[in-house]
A protein has these predicted regions:
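Generic structural "secondary-structure junction" signal
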Residues: 21, 26, 31, 44-45, ...
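Generic structural signal for secondary-structure transition and capping sites
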Residues: 43-47, 95, 209
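Rieske [2Fe-2S] iron-sulfur-binding domain
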Residues: 55-159, 163-173
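C-terminal catalytic domain of Rieske-type non-heme iron oxygenases
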Residues: 57, 82, 88, 147, ...
Length: 255
């Protein structure tokens, strides 16, 4: 209920004021047109995380990103162990092929029954005689650029993207000591709120609220204010947590 009231307040604000000589219109956080622009200029041009690598660790497994979006992507591990990424759209009529993570020998469109091997090749066309000169061997799912880093499969929807390592602007070196590829999920929770991605991201970058909301956890073990750095198209925030106090607290509450 409290979260719903906060979201409703954002909707009603004509402007979100800040210190200095600038202000930000509240609609930037809720307007569908603004979101469409950001999707086109940011998310469909840059590298984004498609799925954790463990979801497609076994041959025959697949994972899906944005299953309800027209720009949905499916990541597969074929029977030979090779990783692939494709637009989640049947080459026949564009219907979504995958609705959820799974495992099997083929991807099958639930609309007309066209099926594909996990390497993207068209495998079966029901009543193929009605399609004249269609050559199944010449048709396949549209491939999407992908790369693996930090235990994640990254994808890029643009036609000729720069290498992931170039895009990360050195952040990959900063993250390497954390061995993210060795981490395993312990809990998954899904929240649905009527705001777009910026509200979630800005909350993560907003250390200003930590003293009030997280006073007995993170804030109690932070040595100093976070360090912010602009790296190309990215913003990096380093938060220095007192290691021994933090580790002791985790041991007491999580062991």
């Amino acid at each position: 209920e409290e979260r719903a009231e906060s979201v409703d307040t954002i909707h009603k604000l004509p402007r979100v004021e800040r210190f200095g000589d600038r202000s930000i219109e509240g609609r930037r956080y809720t307007d569908p047109g603004q979101l469409d622009l950001e999707l086109a200029l940011v998310f469909r041009r840059g590298w984004v995380v498609g799925c954790p690598l463990w979801q497609v660790s076994e041959p025959g497994s697949w994972s899906v990103l944005n299953e309800t979006s027209p720009f949905s992507v499916v990541v597969t591990r074929d029977t030979n162990g090779t990783l692939h990424a494709f637009r989640n759209a049947c080459v026949h009529r564009g219907s979504s092929i995958v609705k959820a993570c799974g495992k099997g020998t083929a991807l099958r469109c639930a609309y007309h029954g066209w099926s594909y091997s996990l390497d993207g090749r068209l495998r079966e066309v029901p009543r193929a005689e009605g399609f004249g000169g269609v050559d199944p061997h010449a048709m396949r799912l549209k491939a999407v650029s992908h790369a693996v880093f930090a235990g994640m499969v990254w994808i890029n929807l643009s036609e000729d993207p720069e290498p992931l390592a170039t895009s990360l602007m050195g952040i990959d070196e900063d993250l390497e000591p954390y061995a993210l590829s060795e981490m395993e999920p312990i809990q998954e929770r899904v929240f649905s709120v009527p705001v777009n991605w910026k509200s979630m991201m800005e909350n993560a970058f907003d250390y200003y609220h930590a003293a009030e909301v997280h006073r007995h956890t993170i804030h109690a073990h932070v040595d100093s204010a976070p360090e912010l750095a602009i790296l190309g198209d990215h913003m990096c925030q380093n938060l220095h947590i007192a290691p021994y106090k933090w580790r002791r607290m985790l041991d007491e509450h999580c062991s």
